[in-house]
């Protein structure tokens, strides 16, 4: 066990984490030259295209160090985006050390700081590595100082490397061997294995990635999942090199996969503990929290025939994604669908893209909302993640909205514009520190403002250099109202939203103007209104199409013309009473995209 090293890499998007892992695999001969491709571990197409890591992956490599000994390196790749911080905390729970990879040209970013603190809280040895030193703009000394000032880790003499051209990769491996502690644990104790990740394979069923804390698990043995108490038999186990390599057993300190023919998605929940069926351990591996969705949205298929496929697709995805929540929902405008809970906006976009791409579904997503608390006059507290759960306005004493503490790191040239957008989003400044070239700004912001389009706005005003990390800190009372959209007097449930009273008129006007352009003209007038309770705050009218009924009259008597015009008027009136307005899908999509 003294020659095992379990570590993961903490890095911001684009700081070269996946490239560095490619180099590790190359140096340790994990794959042949023919099988090597860029970003080996980012196995989903969408991960490659966006250049981000979403799922945690693992690789076991044998490295012969300069001291002549062979070490088993278990490397768990982690995502860098704030939405996937739960994947990060899970991966870190299986390690003893973490490499903090920082781009020597760009410096420290907010999400790196957050993940780094998670690692320090879990008592991991954090080792700073400066990557991309081949770039002409690299300033390793300045960045090392930034790491010390912002994160508080000693970065003097930090290992430098360039993963892209392969300089210094062996130095990084030597640093891992020297500084990451060997795992603790007893091979002869009762089995305790932590499930880091589970995914569904069409041929094998559920494949679980586990870190054995104590004991040994062998092929053919029976084990049970502690939270459910159900027992299974091990069909296959082994490690990823990154290909699947079968072994006879996994012992304490090792990381590998287990296949036990589990068919049910929830049979091996992520974060659970496995133990022997006949000689179980008493306590599960600690340090695991259930993740709560932060953003909710309704998802509907464009054609109702796809509903069963949609349900199956969500069930399969939720196996690979412990943080996805969904329940059935019915909307008058959009039909049957699901109310889904996500960690954040990127998570929502990625789930939608995976559903559309991997399962060929056409989806509409309703406007994202967060969880509000409605306190009724009788003292009852209702958690509102869906507008249909909101009580009548007369019964509500107050509505509380979630507030997040946002840490924003930006180059000092952009401070003014960042403060401006924070104020526009109803933010309250908590702190502002200058650290070298960077400025760390802390704001308390309403969560709904952060999840709608704050990240995009931040990126555009800081030319892409701003980075953001946020966490929910409290709920506080706010003057929120429900903004309904009426078309010819009928409410359209899919377009309703909860907004702050100060912004309601502006939002309502913007919404009706946008709908006016999107709803095609009918044979009768269409009134589009935005309302708060019984008060109309904005209105716009789609004018009627008009057929020229006088065309066949030529000269003719004026009373004859009047009669025809009156008849047309009557018809339009009747049509308006009974005609229903077809709202095209594009109208929903473009309104909800905002």
Curated annotation (Swiss-Prot):
GO aspect biological process, one term: positive regulation of translation
Recorded catalytic activity of this chain's protein: GTP + H2O = GDP + phosphate + H(+)
GO molecular-function term, one example from the UniProt record: GTPase activity
Membrane topology (UniProt): Peripheral membrane protein
Class of the enzyme per the UniProt entry, highest EC level: hydrolase
Pfam families listed in its UniProt record: EFG_C, GTP_EFTU, GTP_EFTU_D2, LepA_C
Binding site for GTP: 14-19, 131-134
Keyword Protein transport: no
Keywords noted in UniProt: Cell inner membrane, Cell membrane, GTP-binding, Hydrolase, Membrane, Nucleotide-binding, Protein biosynthesis
Main localization (coarse): membrane
Assigned EC number: 3.6.5.n1
Compartment(s) of residence: Cell inner membrane
Cellular component aspect of the GO annotation: plasma membrane
All residue ranges annotated as the tr-type G domain in the record: 2-184
InterPro entries found in the cross-reference section: EF-4, EFG_III/V, EFG_V-like, EFTu-like_2, G_TR_CS, LepA_C_sf, LepA_CTD, LepA_IV
Function: Required for accurate and efficient protein synthesis under certain stress conditions. May act as a fidelity factor of the translation reaction, by catalyzing a one-codon backward translocation of tRNAs on improperly translocated ribosomes. Back-translocation proceeds from a post-translocation (POST) complex to a pre-translocation (PRE) complex, thus giving elongation factor G a second chance to translocate the tRNAs correctly. Binds to ribosomes in a GTP-dependent manner.
Similarity comment: Belongs to the TRAFAC class translation factor GTPase superfamily. Classic translation factor GTPase family. LepA subfamily.
Protein name in UniProt: Elongation factor 4
Species annotation: Francisella tularensis subsp. tularensis (strain SCHU S4 / Schu 4)
Gene behind this protein: lepA
């Amino acid at each position: 066990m003294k020659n095992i090293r379990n570590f993961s890499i903490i890095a911001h998007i684009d700081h070269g984490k996946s490239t560095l892992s490619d180099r590790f695999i190359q140096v340790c001969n994990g794959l042949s030259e023919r099988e090597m491709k860029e970003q080996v571990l980012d196995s989903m197409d969408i991960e490659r295209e966006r250049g981000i890591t979403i799922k945690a992956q693992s690789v076991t490599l044998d490295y012969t160090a300069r001291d002549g000994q062979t070490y088993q390196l278990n490397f768990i790749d982690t995502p860098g985006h704030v939405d996937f911080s739960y994947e990060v905390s899970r991966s870190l729970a299986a390690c003893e050390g973490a490499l903090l990879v920082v781009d020597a040209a760009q410096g420290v970013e907010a999400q790196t700081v957050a993940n780094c603190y998670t690692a320090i809280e879990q008592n991991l040895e954090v080792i700073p590595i400066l990557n991309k030193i081949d770039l002409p703009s690299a300033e390793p000394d300045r960045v090392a100082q930034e790491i010390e000032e912002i994160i508080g880790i000693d970065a003097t003499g930090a290992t430098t490397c360039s993963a892209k051209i392969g300089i210094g990769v062996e130095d990084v491996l030597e640093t891992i061997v020297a500084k990451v502690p060997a795992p603790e644990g007893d091979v002869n104790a009762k089995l305790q294995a932590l499930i880091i990740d589970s995914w569904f394979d069409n041929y094998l069923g559920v494949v679980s990635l586990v870190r054995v804390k104590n004991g040994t698990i062998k092929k053919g043995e029976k084990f049970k999942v502690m939270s459910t108490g159900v027992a299974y038999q091990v069909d296959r186990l082994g490690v990823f090199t990154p290909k699947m390599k079968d072994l006879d057993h996994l012992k304490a300190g090792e990381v590998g996969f287990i296949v036990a023919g589990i068919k049910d998605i929830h049979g091996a929940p992520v974060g659970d503990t496995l133990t022997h069926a006949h000689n179980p351990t008493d306590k599960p591996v600690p340090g695991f929290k259930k993740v709560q969705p932060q953003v909710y949205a309704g998802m509907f298929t464009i054609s109702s025939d796809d509903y069963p496929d949609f349900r199956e697709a969500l069930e399969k995805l939720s196996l690979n994604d412990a943080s996805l929540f969904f329940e059935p929902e019915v909307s008058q405008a959009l039909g049957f669908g699901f109310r889904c809970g996500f960690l954040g906006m990127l998570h929502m976009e990625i789930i939608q893209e995976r559903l559309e791409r991997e399962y060929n579904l056409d989806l509409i997503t309703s406007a994202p909302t967060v969880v509000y608390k409605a306190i009724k006059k009788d003292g009852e507290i209702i958690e509102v993640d869906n507008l249909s759960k909101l009580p009548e306005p007369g019964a509500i004493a107050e509505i509380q909205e979630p507030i997040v503490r946002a840490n924003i790191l930006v180059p000092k040239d952009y401070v003014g514009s960042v403060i401006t957008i924070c104020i526009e989003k109803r933010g309250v400044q908590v702190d502002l520190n200058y650290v070298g070239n960077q400025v760390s700004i802390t704001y308390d912001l309403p969560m709904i403002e952060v999840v709608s389009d704050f990240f995009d706005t931040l990126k555009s005003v800081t030319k892409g250099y701003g980075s953001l990390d946020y966490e929910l800190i409290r709920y506080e009372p706010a003057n929120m109202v429900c903004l309904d959209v009426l078309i010819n007097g009928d409410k359209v449930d899919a377009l309703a939203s909860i907004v702050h009273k100060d912004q309601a008129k502006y939002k309502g006007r913007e919404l009706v103007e946008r709908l006016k352009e999107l709803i095609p003209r009918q044979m009768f007038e269409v009134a589009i209104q935005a309302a708060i309770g019984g008060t109309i705050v904005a209105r716009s009218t789609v004018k009627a199409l008009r057929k020229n009924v006088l065309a066949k009259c030529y000269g003719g008597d004026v009373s004859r013309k009047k009669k025809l015009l009156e008849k047309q008027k009557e018809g339009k009136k009747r049509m308006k009473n009974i005609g229903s307005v077809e709202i095209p899908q594009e109208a929903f999509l473009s309104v909800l995209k905002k």
